[in-house]
Amino acid sequence: NADVIVLALYPEDIKEALSKLKFSLQKRIKSNYEQKLTILCGTNKNHMMSKLENFLLDDLKIEKEWYCSNVALRDMIIRRSSNSDAKDAVQLTTKIVQTLLIQSPVYFDVSKFKWFELNNNLEMMKDIKLFTYNSPHAACAYVGYKYGYQTIEEASKNKDIKTIMEACVLEAKKGILSSFEITAEELDDFVEKANETLNK
């Protein structure tokens, strides 16, 4: 009877999870046909939803009419910051630093959740995130390692490394504006939030 199912998994594990849900979905079709269901996939890999939808309908043989009328299979972007005491530590500290971006539309009331935010262009935003969040983060990790820092948090406080990170974002913005349908103002807002994340 769930309204929402969240699959916070590695990309390669999502099909297996959907396979395990098959029995429950078939039971729901028989006993609770009209109730709406949202399935959220929390992974950094992009452009997966259509393949997963085809997997549900073609491979798992979930009834198409029921699925199209009652199920929203959606992607999301988890914007978080993780730290550890050492690079080989198995215990991580993770905190949410911005709202969870969810591909719209969905079948539940997002307004009831403080940290949830719907987004109409999630695939594009996920691609952009790769350049505005991940590229300076990766540069910081690489250069920080060369400088002898143990953590990204320490490295990001170095003036020279911070300059390199900012240069990565500036270079990325040029390519993004020429490749994606996003305004400079929208991109600046997205990048500003990215910088807030990296500085936390």
Language-model segments: residues:
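Substrate/ligand-engaging "lid" and interaction regions
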Residues: 1-200
